[in-house]
């Protein structure tokens, strides 16, 4: 440290190695020096419930906490003292906070509303925004378009013009809908919108224009497009949106990110942050087995265009898989409308049910869905039916109805229950025998009455997220109703068994293959399953803070705490993703840590836990 300061005082050039070693010493020496409970009366400690989120203002001198029991806490970041406490900021849990400037901020809640606040007068809200039909889980602000952006578990993304008030309220618009939406983030430069979902994929919208987003992506359903990719079954209503992935899409171009570490079959991607310099994105996901959580860093930038393609002025063709299909002559399916997930009644049980079998449906030429065993003539008319991955949408709706009916029997409250999920497709499907695929019964049990086995009941009571998608396949010789026994989970996979893999004779179609984006990863503990843990970047982007049990871990990209890799180093990491390097591990809380946030101005870290404690950390040099 003395050598570094001496060189800087003398005006000598600071070597990168010296800078890295200094940053490593600063971050690895982080220690707790104050806590919210230490400044409370003993009777007040923990009354606010869990701390779900923390947010600094742009100057870094104010911290706002969102709590489980409807409360908003405002702290002075310099003295760590509580400035304001709003006990009934909402009528339900407060989930998220977003500052517009030094004094104005918004909060989102499980009461389906967004509230606007001014630090100069915390006695009342500036305005309450109504529009969502489910829990509001994320708020962003686009300084470029001057629009507030909110998203919730209803799958909807709304924009609000907070500068144009009318008698009916603020001017708002629903610009996009994605089933299973968990989080959305706008990059600091305002040119990208990133969505993470419960479907095991991340969606990046490049060259973001919120004013035309609704028109540019009207009708596009990323969940159905992902089903087509996983099942390798051509779906006309999904494939007709190939143009949104094209380089010719000058505004609101879409890219899907689906690669994850080995042994991490990502399902519920529940937290999302973007690097301060817009280099990458940080996510935290729950694997499909619900036994592990993972922190991952993916590249957020567009894939480079080859120089020969630029010179020839020819659009580069993305990598695609060739699939054969007979749908070219039978693509007259009715376009489905976007449907919100079923609304939830607050404070009721939210534990999902599990399903252990799937009936594969098929569509005839008129688009009417039915089970393959409903009509005996199916076996002799194999060419008049098409594989129906659209049955996944029916499954989603049926599952939501079942969950709605089952809420009374379970009192568990989870941060991401009632969000349907499919897995990312990283791990192979477990081996299934032909007998289990075909089933011994010709009339399978309906989806609404799963078998009440002990394993299903135990899994249903110990897990907090479930998947609800299905794929269908048919044989070249006959169409048979297939019950896919996949344990306690509905999973979508591409099957290679001759029993289920269809073969077609007509022209083939290509399906886009997503680019590899994974850079770094780390395995996490799965303590307090059902609660969302929010990681975060440091202000300089060198360090990642990730909740880990009753504490946090600080990760770096390398042992020497170097900055984000560039040029050749970046290409090496991208070709072979690496584990994040643990710089420090701090355990100071009495309960599981749910959120962590760095100050935008100094090496100051704040964490919040399930017990309601807010803890402050700084370097101890």
Swiss-Prot record:
WD repeats lie at residues 46-85, 89-127, 131-170, 176-215, 588-621. Residues 305-349, 437-483 are annotated as: Disordered. SMART domains: WD40 (SM00320). Transmembrane segments: none annotated. Belongs to the WD repeat DCAF10 family. InterPro entries: DCA10 (IPR039085), WD40/YVTN_repeat-like_dom_sf (IPR015943), WD40_repeat_CS (IPR019775), WD40_repeat_dom_sf (IPR036322), WD40_rpt (IPR001680). Residues 324-342 have a biased composition (Polar residues). GO terms for cellular component: Cul4-RING E3 ubiquitin ligase complex. Gene3D superfamilies: YVTN repeat-like/Quinoprotein amine dehydrogenase. Keywords: Phosphoprotein, Repeat, WD repeat. Residues 454-478 have a biased composition (Low complexity). This is DDB1- and CUL4-associated factor 10 homolog. The keyword Transmembrane does not apply. The keyword Membrane does not apply. The modification Phosphoserine is found at residues 307, 494, 497.
């Amino acid at each position: 440290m003395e050598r570094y300061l001496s060189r800087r005082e003398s005006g000598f050039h600071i070597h990168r190695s010296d800078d890295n070693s200094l940053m490593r010493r600063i971050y690895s020496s982080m220690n707790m020096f104050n806590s919210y409970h230490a400044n409370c009366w003993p009777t007040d400690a923990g009354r606010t419930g869990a701390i779900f989120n923390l947010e600094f203002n742009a100057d870094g001198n104010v911290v706002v906490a969102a709590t489980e029991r409807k409360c908003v806490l405002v702290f002075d970041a310099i003295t760590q003292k509580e400035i304001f406490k709003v006990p009934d900021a909402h009528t339900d849990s407060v989930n998220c906070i977003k500052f517009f400037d030094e004094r104005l901020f918004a909060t989102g809640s499980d009461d389906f509303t967004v509230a606007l606040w001014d630090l100069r007068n915390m006695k009342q809200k500036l305005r309450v925004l109504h529009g969502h039909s489910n829990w509001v889980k994320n708020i962003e602000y686009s300084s470029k378009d001057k629009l507030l952006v909110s998203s919730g578990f209803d799958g909807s993304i709304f924009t609000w013009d907070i500068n144009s008030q009318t008698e009916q309220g603020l001017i708002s618009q629903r610009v996009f809908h994605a089933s299973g939406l968990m989080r959305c983030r706008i990059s600091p430069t305002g040119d990208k919108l990133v969505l993470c979902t419960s479907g095991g994929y991340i969606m990046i919208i490049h060259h973001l224009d919120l004013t035309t987003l609704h028109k540019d992506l009207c009708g596009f359903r990323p969940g159905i497009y992902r089903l087509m990719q996983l099942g390798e079954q051509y779906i006309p209503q999904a494939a007709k949106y190939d143009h949104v992935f094209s380089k010719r899409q000058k505004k609101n171009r879409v890219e899907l990110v689906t690669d994850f570490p080995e042994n991490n079959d990502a399902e519920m991607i529940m937290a999302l942050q973007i690097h301060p310099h817009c280099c990458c994105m940080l996510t935290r996901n729950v694997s499909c087995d619900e036994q592990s959580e993972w922190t991952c860093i993916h590249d957020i930038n567009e894939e480079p265009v080859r120089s020969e393609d630029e010179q020839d002025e020819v659009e580069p063709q993305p990598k695609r898989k060739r699939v054969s299909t007979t749908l070219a002559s039978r693509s007259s399916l009715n376009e489905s409308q976007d449907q919100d997930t079923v609304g939830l009644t607050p404070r009721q049980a939210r534990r999902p049910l599990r399903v252990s079998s799937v009936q594969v449906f098929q569509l005839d030429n008129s688009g009417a869905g039915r089970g393959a065993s409903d009509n005996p003539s199916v076996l002799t008319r194999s060419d008049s039916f098409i594989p129906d991955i659209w049955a996944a949408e029916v499954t989603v709706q049926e599952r939501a109805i079942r969950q709605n009916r089952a809420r009374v029997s379970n009192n568990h409250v989870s941060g991401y229950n009632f969000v349907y999920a499919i897995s990312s497709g990283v791990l192979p499907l477990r081996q299934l025998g032909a007998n289990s695929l075909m089933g011994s019964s010709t009339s399978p049990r309906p989806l609404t009455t799963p078998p009440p086995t002990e394993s299903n009941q135990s899994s249903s009571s110990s897990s907090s997220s479930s998947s609800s998608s299905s794929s269908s396949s048919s044989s070249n010789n006959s169409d048979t109703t297939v019950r896919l026994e996949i344990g306690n989970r509905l999973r979508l996979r591409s099957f290679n068994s001759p029993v289920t893999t269809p073969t077609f004779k007509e022209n083939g179609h290509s399906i886009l293959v997503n680019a590899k984006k994974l850079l770094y990863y780390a395995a996490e503990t799965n303590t307090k399953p059902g609660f969302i843990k929010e990681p975060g970047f440091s202000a300089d982007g060198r360090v990642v803070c990730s909740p880990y049990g009753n504490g946090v871990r600080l990760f770096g990209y390398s042992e020497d705490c170097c900055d984000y890799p560039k040029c050749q180093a970046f290409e090496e990491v991208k070709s072979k993703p690496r584990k994040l390097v643990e710089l420090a591990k701090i355990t100071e809380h009495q309960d599981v840590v749910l959120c962590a946030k760095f100050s935008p101005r100094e090496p100051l870290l704040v964490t919040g836990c399930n017990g309601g404690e807010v803890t402050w950390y700084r370097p101890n040099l």
